[in-house]
């Protein structure tokens, strides 16, 4: 229950921080621009006249698009109303990046632990899609993802090895 409350607070905080920082409205096929806690609750409340909303676990499962990648989030949002569960991890130089696993072996062209690399070192690798195909995409930072998400979608942070105070919410 404590973990659920923490994740809810982080999700809400990320969403509202993004809305407060956003000076302009984003436009896209299924973008969601939520400006208050009440709107957030309404958005998650079932209403038969509204389209079904998908939780994109790690960003979705589209061939050619890797998990925990902004381009994947954008692709999923182009197809359906979505919010995204993402996985923050800490690099050796304390940059928060998106990566589900503690290692980069499965999802990138590199090997080893995320925490053994600096952010700059991680940028030499390319992300792979779920079939293992190499894509042109790189590992994003949590900050890049939050900036991208403003006025577009909701992020649900699945806290791994990053302390919640590091997220700044």
Regions found by a protein language model. Name each.
Residues 1-27:
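Bacterial Sec-dependent N-terminal signal peptides
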Residues 19-169:
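Phosphate-group recognition and catalysis centered on beta-loop-alpha active-site segments
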